[in-house]
Design a protein with these regions (language model features):
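Conserved alpha-helix/loop element of class I SAM-dependent methyltransferases that forms part
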Residues: 1-11
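Conserved class I S-adenosyl-L-methionine
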Residues: 10-19, 101-126
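Class I SAM-dependent methyltransferase SAM/SAH-binding core
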Residues: 20-64
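A conserved beta-strand element that flanks and buttresses the S-adenosyl-L-methionine
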Residues: 76
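A short glycine-rich, Lys/Arg-flanked "PGG" loop and its adjoining helix->strand segment in the class I
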Residues: 88-100
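Short alpha-helix
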Residues: 130-154
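A C-terminal cap/extension of S-adenosyl-L-methionine-dependent methyltransferases
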Residues: 152-216
Length: 216
């Protein structure tokens, strides 16, 4: 997340769907001014217990953020889109309140782990029974539908089915592996491009008299 988001210390970030505060802690360690939002008072209580007064916490929904336009330098939706009622509206709101970059982290629809979760949910109830999963391509299409052609970067996390070790760890962190669109977890950063509305201004103009005498 840090490599994609490239935050500057002292700037502000909103964690949308902060839950118990796992991401809040990581964002705070980056030197950011952190605000968290979640619809669950239970989750917010746990986040407050973990973070204390180091962050600001609000109760609210991703589809209707209680903040003004451009309130934050960055926003994060870390495993949030899977559980909201309207993912596209959640993205619109994130783009509205953010000035610079938005990080989106999701469980990959086409990863082997993602398929296993869906199959497991058929036979026993899990937290993922009502979750929506997304692929890298679906996220990019949704983003472009909402705000047009903007710079987008992404990486995935792959867990190779071989014994762990230094070589395996280095391989999993290599750029080639992280560019695999079938990794278990996908992280994407959207760079927001300012857009300006223009309108014609009435400028006073008086035509010269073509019949007037020439001077000189």
């Amino acid at each position: 997340m840090k490599d994609l988001l490239q935050p500057m210390r002292g700037e502000s970030v909103l964690d949308i769907g902060c839950g118990t505060g796992a991401c809040l802690s990581a964002l705070h360690e980056m030197g950011l001014q952190v605000t968290g939002l979640d619809p669950s008072t239970y989750m917010l209580d746990m986040a407050l217990e973990k973070m204390g007064n180091r962050v600001e916490l609000y109760r609210g929904f991703a589809e209707d953020l209680p903040f003004d336009d451009n309130s934050f330098n960055y926003s994060c939706l870390f495993t949030t889109l899977e559980f909201v009622n309207d993912p596209a509206q959640a993205l619109r709101e994130a783009f509205r309140v953010t000035k610079d970059r938005v990080f989106i982290g999701v469980f990959n629809r086409y990863a082997i782990k993602g398929i296993q979760r869906r199959v497991k949910g058929i036979f026993s109830p899990t937290i993922f029974n009502h979750a929506q999963f997304f692929s890298v391509w679906e996220l990019k299409q949704m983003i472009r539908t909402i705000i047009g052609q903007v710079p987008v970067s992404w990486r995935t996390v792959c867990q190779l089915p071989i014994p762990s070790g230094k070589l395996v760890t280095n391989l999993e962190h290599s750029k080639i592996v992280q560019r695999c669109p079938f990794g278990a977890f996908a992280g994407m950063v959207v760079v927001l491009v300012p857009r300006f509305k223009t309108r014609p201004l009435a400028a006073p103009y008086q035509a010269k008299d073509p019949t007037g005498a020439a001077t000189g």
